[in-house]
């Protein structure tokens, strides 16, 4: 499994502002305890990969601090936006990706006001908390891809009518 290193954990008390790195965050059933975006919705926790931040820094020719894109968790090791519906687990914590990207708030976003662009609409991800716990910089999460079980059903009117026995494939168990 792929390991994801936590580079920073960040909180803001008000929406539309840059998040501030803190020593530890507590993930609970509504998201990050004490964060403005916590609540009973599908975007409880925001994550952004250092790889995405570095790409933005190169394009904007500006250094970006952790939390500046208002992400709760800054990670390294996996391009997060390529993993819809997957899970990240570690230290008893379990997060499930619920959304990739978001609508840009334009002037309602601190980084957009300053730079004129933002990475979150395309590469930021959002997750819900399945199992909570404490998380800090230096911790690791394990990437767990969602396994999709697929069954193919072949229907035959002639076999159903008893004209012949359909032997095309095994029965689904």
Predicted regions and their residues:
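Metal-cofactor-dependent catalytic cores
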Residues: 1-148, 160
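Glycine-rich phosphate/diphosphate-binding loop of Rossmann-like nucleotide-binding domains
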Residues: 148-173
């Amino acid at each position: 499994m792929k390991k994801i290193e936590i580079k920073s954990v960040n909180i803001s008390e008000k929406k539309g502002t840059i998040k501030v790195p803190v020593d530890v965050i507590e993930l609970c059933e509504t998201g990050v305890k004490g964060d403005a975006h916590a609540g009973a919705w599908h975007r409880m926790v925001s994550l952004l990969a250092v790889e995405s931040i570095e790409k933005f820094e190169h394009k904007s020719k500006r250094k970006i601090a952790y939390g500046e894109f208002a992400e709760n968790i800054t990670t390294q090791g996996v391009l997060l936006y390529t993993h819809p519906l997957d899970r990240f687990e570690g230290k008893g914590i379990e997060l499930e990706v619920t959304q990739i990207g978001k609508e840009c708030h334009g002037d309602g976003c601190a980084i957009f006001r300053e730079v004129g662009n933002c990475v979150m609409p395309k590469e930021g991800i959002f997750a819900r908390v399945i199992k909570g716990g404490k998380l800090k910089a230096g911790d690791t999460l394990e990437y767990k891809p969602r396994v999709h079980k697929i069954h193919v059903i072949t229907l035959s009117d002639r076999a159903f009518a008893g004209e012949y026995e359909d032997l095309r494939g095994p029965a689904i168990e």
